[in-house]
UniProtKB/Swiss-Prot annotation:
Residues 331-352 are annotated as: Disordered. A lipid is attached at residues 322-323 (S-palmitoyl cysteine). Gene3D superfamilies: Rhodopsin 7-helix transmembrane proteins. It holds the Pfam family 7tm_1. Phosphorylated on some or all of the serine and threonine residues present in the C-terminal region. This is Rhodopsin. GO terms for molecular function: 11-cis retinal binding; G protein-coupled photoreceptor activity.
């Protein structure tokens, strides 16, 4: 084995020299240069500095503007709440521990940080899935005479919390476990070992299939069908410039949304699966740390994609920030009017 396994931790370094120490008790500067821990702390500070205002502003603007409190926007608020979970439950902890060079908060702190970081990430993941399903149902109308209402929106939000809990809770009660990962300053599910009594193998397989492959397939299907519907509507009105413009806008949004989803979860899931299927192989701490950066960064670019790209949200945010006035109001209004003129409005398919 090219690593050192201890009680509730796994260090990706063979302890031939005797320098490996518990990540709960000693700085891990023998793994990477101490400057790397400073960079990690600075990166977490950046995510907090940007992620908190953007997501908090989303909640505040929605409370301030009644027209935003529609059932279709409930899932976006849920996404903002999930990102705030990651900011407070994960980023702040990782920033603090990276300043010490090890997981100074101990085993209990590892469980708490791992739980909240996983819960927030999973709520965000399933929010994107529910969002894709909602857009598909509203635009493609696979169910005739179906009207999307508040009860459906609440059910969608409840579903995200249920699925997130189904992923974040088991490691707390014995199905797998949370251990320090990467540079040993943050905690995640144990992909690294086959520790007795924790059934890590079955949990990792369950996570990979249920919490990555299925969401990826659903998002791909829904946005694929949505693109087809938009292109069919545009083809039926080829003479309409506004329809063609809306079709291009929606296509661009869908591509960005799918790419955002893949950038967030594909690196992390792929590396986690590789580590699980190659347990005992040699890999350095950055191997798991870098993909986690992509997943954590979603707390910034998810709001940018799913909220700021929506004309209505964007208009209300600018109005709130500019004390009730929107200096770009004429441009926003003209763009919205043109889009609404098309048979398939981009606002119906856009991220909000």
């Amino acid at each position: 084995m090219n690593g050192t396994e201890g009680p509730f931790f796994y260090i990706p370094m063979v302890n031939t020299t005797g320098i490996v120490r518990s990540p709960y008790e000693y700085p891990q500067y023998y793994l990477v240069n101490p400057a790397a821990y400073a960079c990690l702390g600075a990166y977490m500070f950046f995510l907090i500095l940007v992620g908190f205002p953007v997501n908090f502003l989303t909640l505040y603007v929605t409370l301030e503007h009644k027209k935003l409190r529609t059932p279709l926007n409930y899932i976006l608020l849920n996404l903002a709440v999930a990102d705030l979970f990651m900011v407070f439950g994960g980023f702040t902890t990782t920033m603090y521990t990276s300043m010490h060079g090890y997981f100074v908060l101990g085993r209990l702190g590892c469980n708490i940080e791992g739980f909240f970081a996983t819960l927030g990430g999973e709520i965000a993941l399933w929010s994107l899935v529910v969002l894709a399903i909602e857009r598909w149902v509203v635009v493609c109308k696979p169910i005739s005479n179906f009207r999307f209402g508040e009860n459906h929106a609440i059910m969608g939000v409840a579903f995200t919390w249920f699925m997130a809990s189904a992923c974040a809770v088991p490691p707390l009660v014995g199905w797998s476990r949370y251990i320090p990962e990467g540079m040993q300053c943050s905690c995640g599910v144990d992909y690294y070992t086959r520790a007795e009594g924790f059934n890590n193998e079955s949990f990792v397989i369950y996570m990979f299939i249920v919490h990555f492959c299925i969401p990826l397939a659903v998002v791909g299907f829904c946005y694929g069908r949505l693109l087809c519907a938009v292109k069919e509507a545009a083809a039926a009105q080829q003479e309409s410039e506004t329809t063609q413009r809306a079709e291009r806008e929606v296509s661009r949004m869908v591509v960005i949304m799918v790419i955002g989803f893949l950038v967030c979860w594909l690196p992390y899931a792929s590396v986690a699966w590789y580590i699980f299927t190659h347990q005992g192989s040699e890999f350095g701490p950055p191997f798991m740390t870098v993909p986690a950066f992509f997943a954590k960064s979603s707390s910034i670019y998810n709001p940018m994609i799913y909220i700021c790209m929506n004309k209505q949200f964007r208009h209300c945010m600018i109005t709130t920030l500019c004390c009730g006035k929107n200096p770009f109001e004429e441009e926003e209004g003209a763009s919205t009017t043109k889009t609404e003129a098309s048979s398939v409005s981009s606002s119906s398919v856009s991220p909000a």
